[in-house]
Each structure stands twice: as structure tokens, then as C-alpha cells.
């Protein structure tokens, strides 16, 4: 029996959840525990499960789970298909010993992939011609996976390609699966054993000696970006928009002509920050704007260096096409999505107010966001957290899990849902939902997070398809809590994870668009009957401290989306809990403040004073 369908033995509950849904898996496990075990047989290379109520499910050799035939009459996936796999696994576990895991060889699938429709293979080769790069993960004991610029592929079975899942609209046996297999085969030929690798696909159109700025378009893009940077530094972003509007447009048009997605997205992010500054938006962050401008120029400089190393036969840490995002599509259609909320941020400016909710797909680990805005005149009667999105209140979405059909994802990670694409269900967020998530999103503690941040590449070469400073951390104990009225910020220090120096700083600034968020945070950290055990939020360095700005706080019974709080909670404890920065950090803080001052007001108008302060 074990040799008949070995690929089914590899399907973990997590894999079955990804191939069907969590409800089917939970119900199937419960029914099996209650004794509703089907009779397993096989005939003509097909595995058959016969249930006590007469339902008969048949899974032929070479079929995917959703292709199985079932007499229950359900369209698509059903619990009987899941129970067939689980029952078969239990039967094999009792009749045969577990064989030692063999080394994975994806090359066995090349012959089968060659029989796919011509259209699928042509789409795959078109992506190869653009010089696509694929991030490969193949750690022992973990599911092999491939992260493409706009799709994620996971190989839930090392024996059958039919159980590979992609989060694109096709779901399986698509061009992304083809490319993932090809990348693994090529990478293993060069380096037999690896846990993590970035692999660039090459064709006759992509040579190792090409230069991103050798073409007229590439050189023009670099020049226009440099001109924009010089304009902003000399005049400052506080100057009227008309002074740099043309420079932004020239640089953006040049980046789009080159089809360098991360360069164009960098320009859009920078422009959004500049617009937020002029609109006096609550979510404007001066340090982030400074970082965006610096990273924009650094991205092009890094691309030049990666190309230079490649041209002399040296393997670059990251291919230059990955640095600039060459050939990445602006949108991608997604398959059936199950999303878990990571939190919400409300904002307002002089004309609009709105919100952004972040979700993660537990099957792939990718992060998406949903954004909406409305005229400021409607805010008093309809606060952002109470607005309805697709018939559900925003606060419920921020503290829940959702299922969506036929969605799209933009290049910057935005979840695009048309009005007709209703969310089919929303259930409250639970600690179990977050426990299913893995690294790097969910970290075991602040010590592990520091190490991860030290080892990852610089921001100027990382892709911009999703936020990469959003994490989930454990909370064991709150050791100090206080409201700093001078900074209008609630600070706390908590124990997070094991090891030395495991104190995590939580800081949440007050916001007029979410006035009771700080009160809810203070109340949660002080309660003892249902203490906070997990927290999600954005990580940054504040006055030399690795600091997390909380978005959701999870107790043992429920999740609290802080910005969804719409009523007063409790008074704030007044205290200063943050340590005094060291002399070195104080100098760095002054340096950053001076750079921000120059960025706001321009070098041209404060050259002498800036030199004196420096």
C-alpha cells in the first residue's frame, strides 16, 4: 500500500489545508477521531475510500486532490477527499514502517512538465527571457518552496508535481511551477546541497556580461533619478510641488520604460511621502522619507556593482535584475486566498482619512495590504474603524481571518478586490492562527529578530513587493509602562523570548485618527487575568533601541486590533521608561535630525548653518 501512493504520505495537515481549506481538515480529523473511518481499497491504479453512508471517493494515480472523483456531489474540493488521504496515511502508518526520507530530485518532473500545454511553457520562457530571479528554499525537514517576484510556489510532495501549489489564479501546473522546477534543477546541478539560494534564470537573451546602464534607456533612468535627488536635496521637499513635479515624472517614466519595477515603486513611495508631508498626514514619517530617498540612489548604485561583478565572472550576492525588479508585472491574479490579519493603521490628512490593513497568507508567508480612504468631511460620523469594506466592518477585518476569491495582488503587495469579489467569510483572529505562521514573520523572541535583521540584505536591494519590517513576537511579561507627554507616546518594556538582552521596547504614538489605541494598549499590558502573549507590529530603531510599534495584541482568548478601539478605555500611567541613549547614539540621532532638516528645507537655504552643526 505504501508503494502505491507515496506522495499522499507526504501531505501534512498544513499541506492539506493549503490544498483544500482549514474547515475541511478540521472536520475530517474530528470525524476520523469519532470513528467515521472509510474503507480503503485500490483497483486499476486508483485509491478508493468507501464511507458508511455510501459515499465513494476515488483518486487515480497521477491525479491532484481536487481532481479526485466523489459521489457526494460537491463542486470542487470536499471533506471526503481530505479524509481519503488522512485515512490512507493512518492505514500505512499501522501496516508499514516509515522509510528514510530520500534526497529530493526535482529533475524527475522535467519530462512531465514538457507535456504541459504550449501556452503554459511559452509563458514560462517569456519570463526566463526577462532574466527572472527566483528565491529557493530547501531546508531539511521543511517544504521546498520558490518565491517568484509575483508568485509563491510550494512543493507539498517530493514525489508528485501534482501536489505543487502556486498562489496564482491557476493554482497548480502553471508557468510559475515550471520555472520553480527548472530553477531547482539548475541550482542543484551547480550546488547540490543548499538551504537558501537566489537563482537567476538565463536564456540566449540574457547574457552574463550585460550592463543595466549600457543602454540609452538605462542610462537615462539613472540620470533622471540623480537629477531628482539633487533637486530635492538642494531645494527641500517643503518647496512648492511645481519645483520638482517634472523631475518626478521624468524619473518615473524612465523607470517604467526600462521596466524596472522596484525603481518605479521606490519613486512612487518617495512621492507618496512627499505628498503626505505637504498634506500634513498623520502617517508621515520624516525618517522613512529620508530612508526612501537614500535607498533610491543606492539601489541603482548596487545594480551597477552587481553587474560589474557578474561581468568579471564573480557571482554577485544578488543579480542586478533582482535589485531593480526587471520585468516584474504590475499585477497578478491570485487563487483562493485564506488570509490572517496582522493589524490595521488609521490615518488622516487635511483632505482625506483612511486605513490600511495588513494580512498574511499562512500557506506562503507573503504579506498583503488592503487600503481605503474617504473624504475628511465624513470622518466625524463614520470613523475609519467603523467603515464597512465588502459588507464587513473594518475593525472586524483587522482582528480576523478572511477568505477571498479571485483577488489580485499589485507589485507593491496591495490586495485588489473589485466590488463583486465579496469576502466569503470572516472569523475572529485566534492565537492558533498566529501559531501556524513561521519565520521570518513570526520570531521566537527579540534576540532571534536582532540576528535575522543583522543577516538580511540591505534595504536598498530588497524587493518592494511587501512590507519587510512587520513581525510577530511573543510577550512573556511587562516590566515597565509609561506615557511620555513630551513625545505623546506610550512606551513599554516587555520580556520577549529566551536569552540575554531579551527586553523588547513597545512604543505607540498618539494619533487623532485612532485616539483610544494607546489606552487599549496600556490596559492590555496591565491586565493579569488574560495577559498579552503575542504582539504584531512594525520594527524600527528609535534612539538606538530596536522598537516595535504595536498593531495587534493577542491574549490567550482573543486578538485586539489597537486602532479599532472607538471608545475610551482607561487613564494612562505617566512615567518615563526608556533608557537614556548612549553618547554614540545621541550623535547618530543628531546626525539624522540634521539630514531630515536638510531634506525638509533644502541645502541651498541652510548650507552654512548645516556645516556648522555638522
UniProtKB/Swiss-Prot annotation:
Keywords on record: Metal-binding, Repeat, Zinc, Zinc-finger
Any one annotated GO CC term: cytosol
Zinc finger (SWIM-type): 55-89, 151-185
A Pfam family it matches: SWIM
Molecular-function GO terms, alphabetical: zinc ion binding
Additional remark text: Missing up to 60 C-terminal residues compared to orthologs.
Protein name (Swiss-Prot/TrEMBL): Protein YehQ
Organism, scientific name: Escherichia coli (strain K12)
Amino acid at each position: 500500500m505504501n508503494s502505491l501512493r507515496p506522495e499522499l504520505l507526504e501531505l501534512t495537515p498544513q499541506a492539506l489545508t493549503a490544498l483544500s481549506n482549514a474547515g475541511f481538515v478540521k472536520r475530517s480529523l474530528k470525524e476520523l477521531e469519532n470513528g467515521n473511518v472509510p474503507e480503503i481499497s485500490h483497483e486499476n491504479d486508483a485509491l478508493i475510500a468507501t464511507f458508511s453512508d455510501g459515499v465513494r471517493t476515488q483518486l487515480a494515480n497521477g491525479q491532484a486532490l481536487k481532481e479526485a472523483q466523489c459521489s457526494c456531489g460537491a463542486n470542487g474540493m470536499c471533506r471526503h477527499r481530505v479524509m481519503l488521504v488522512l485515512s490512507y496515511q493512518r492505514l500505512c502508518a499501522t501496516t508499514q514502517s516509515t522509510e528514510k526520507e530520500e534526497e529530493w530530485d526535482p529533475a524527475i518532473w522535467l519530462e512531465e512538465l514538457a507535456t504541459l500545454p504550449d501556452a503554459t511553457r511559452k509563458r514560462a520562457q517569456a519570463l526566463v527571457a526577462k532574466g527572472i530571479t527566483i528565491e529557493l528554499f530547501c531546508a531539511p525537514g521543511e517544504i521546498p518552496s520558490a518565491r517568484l517576484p509575483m508568485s509563491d510556489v510550494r512543493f507539498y510532495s517530493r514525489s508528485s508535481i501534482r501536489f505543487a501549489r502556486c498562489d496564482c489564479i491557476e493554482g497548480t501546473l502553471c508557468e510559475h511551477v515550471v520555472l520553480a522546477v527548472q530553477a531547482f534543477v539548475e541550482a542543484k546541478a551547480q550546488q547540490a546541497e543548499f538551504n537558501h539560494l537566489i537563482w537567476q534564470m538565463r536564456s540566449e537573451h540574457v547574457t552574463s556580461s550585460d550592463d543595466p546602464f549600457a543602454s540609452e534607456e538605462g542610462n537615462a533612468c539613472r540620470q533622471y533619478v540623480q537629477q531628482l535627488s539633487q533637486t530635492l536635496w538642494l531645494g527641500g521637499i517643503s518647496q512648492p510641488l511645481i519645483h520638482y513635479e517634472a523631475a518626478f515624472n521624468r524619473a518615473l517614466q524612465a523607470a517604467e520604460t526600462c521596466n524596472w519595477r522596484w525603481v518605479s515603486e521606490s519613486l512612487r513611495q518617495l512621492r507618496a511621502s512627499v505628498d503626505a508631508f505637504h498634506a500634513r498626514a498623520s502617517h508621515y514619517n520624516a525618517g522613512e522619507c529620508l530612508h526612501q530617498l537614500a535607498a533610491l540612489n543606492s539601489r541603482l548604485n548596487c545594480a551597477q556593482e552587481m553587474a560589474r561583478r557578474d561581468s568579471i565572472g564573480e557571482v554577485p550576492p544578488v543579480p542586478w535584475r533582482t535589485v531593480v525588479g526587471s520585468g516584474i508585472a504590475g499585477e497578478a491574479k491570485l487563487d483562493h486566498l485564506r488570509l490572517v490579519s496582522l493589524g490595521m493603521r488609521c490615518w488622516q490628512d487635511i483632505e482625506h482619512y483612511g486605513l490600511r490593513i495588513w494580512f498574511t497568507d499562512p500557506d506562503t508567508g507573503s504579506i498583503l495590504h488592503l487600503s481605503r480612504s474617504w473624504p475628511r468631511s465624513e470622518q466625524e460620523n463614520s470613523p475609519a474603524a467603523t467603515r464597512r469594506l465588502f459588507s464587513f466592518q473594518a475593525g472586524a477585518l483587522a482582528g480576523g481571518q478572511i477568505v477571498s476569491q479571485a483577488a489580485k495582488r499589485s507589485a507593491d503587495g496591495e490586495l485588489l478586490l473589485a466590488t463583486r469579489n465579496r469576502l466569503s467569510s470572516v472569523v475572529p483572529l485566534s492565537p492558533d492562527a498566529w501559531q501556524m505562521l513561521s519565520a521570518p514573520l513570526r520570531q521566537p523572541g527579540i534576540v532571534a529578530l536582532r540576528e535575522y535583521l543583522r543577516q538580511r540584505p540591505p534595504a536598498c536591494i530588497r524587493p518592494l513587493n511587501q512590507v519587510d519590517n512587520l513581525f510577530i513576537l511573543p510577550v512573556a511579561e511587562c516590566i515597565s509602562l509609561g506615557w511620555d507627554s513630551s513625545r505623546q507616546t506610550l512606551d513599554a518594556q516587555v520580556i520577549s523570548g529566551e536569552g540575554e538582552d531579551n527586553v523588547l521596547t513597545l512604543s505607540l504614538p498618539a494619533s487623532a485618527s485612532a485616539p483610544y489605541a494607546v489606552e487599549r494598549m496600556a490596559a492590555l499590558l496591565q491586565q493579569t487575568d488574560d495577559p498579552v502573549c503575542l504582539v504584531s507590529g512594525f520594527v524600527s530603531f528609535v534612539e538606538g533601541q530596536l522598537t516595535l510599534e504595536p498593531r495587534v495584541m493577542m491574549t490567550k482568548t482573543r486578538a485586539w486590533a489597537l486602532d479599532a478601539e472607538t471608545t475610551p478605555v482607561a487613564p494612562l500611567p505617566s512615567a518615563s521608561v526608556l533608557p537614556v541613549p548612549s553618547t554614540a547614539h545621541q550623535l547618530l540621532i543628531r546626525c539624522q535630525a540634521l539630514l531630515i532638516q536638510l531634506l525638509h528645507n533644502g541645502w541651498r537655504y541652510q548650507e552654512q548653518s548645516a556645516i556648522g552643526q555638522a
